[in-house]
């Protein structure tokens, strides 16, 4: 008899029960790992699967996380074979070519489309009912690409979008007002990145509209220069990349925030990337961020935001820029 047999006597043969809320992270780069640790530390799933083409890096990261199993409640698995991801509830895609210093998110496109042609069919094969969350940049275009390649209905393909931009925005407004970001309600919509649209008309603290107090807020003529805050949001990622080489922690926490709303069926409203054709005067098949309700079935509803004419124009301009790139893509 082995030590194990001497120690433990079976009462019944265990039937394998699949995980109810398995999450997969595709890509073990900086963003993938920050997403993984954020998901683990928030205890969101009972199984976390990780997959990447870089076998040694993947093996090392998985092993490193598994060594912390005592401090976690999540089973951690990893393999370059996508069978490890089977029956995931949410699949987070962070894989792709990384943005170089000074490189625009749009420049990354075709490099990442080619990577997605391998990743997406594999995800669909093993988790045909999952909710796909795209994080790789440029996120709005790649969410469209994932939607096209997966054949999933639009409510099951979500881009992390401006969830992070809005968090950065709220943090900076909070800094200026000496308040916690959760008390500074503010939304950034449109494209994640350079042409994102700050909705100044909706910025409020405790229901008090800041534009009511300062009608010039967000315009060139504003003596307090609130507009600079949005510039800081846009420049924020480039600044971090310049200083440390990549961004990871905030996007990782942002991803975990979205995964939590889905897995816990919270019906929380997040600015995430979805098909906006027919909204805010957008005519083309593009994905942009608008406030959306997230729950167990994915993206169930869109909130109709009241945008000012110039804000709406900016959204349409983003849409045109993205469509200009999308129609050139070979899918």
From Swiss-Prot:
The keyword NAD applies. Keywords: Cytoplasm, NAD, Oxidoreductase. The keyword Metal-binding does not apply. It is found in: Cytoplasm. One of its GO terms (molecular function) is L-lactate dehydrogenase activity. NAD(+) binds at residues 29-57, 98, 137. It catalyses: (S)-lactate + NAD(+) = pyruvate + NADH + H(+). Pathway: Fermentation; pyruvate fermentation to lactate; (S)-lactate from pyruvate: step 1/1. Its EC number is 1.1.1.27. Homotetramer. Belongs to the LDH/MDH superfamily. LDH family. Interconverts simultaneously and stereospecifically pyruvate and lactate with concomitant interconversion of NADH and NAD(+). This is L-lactate dehydrogenase A chain. The gene is ldha.
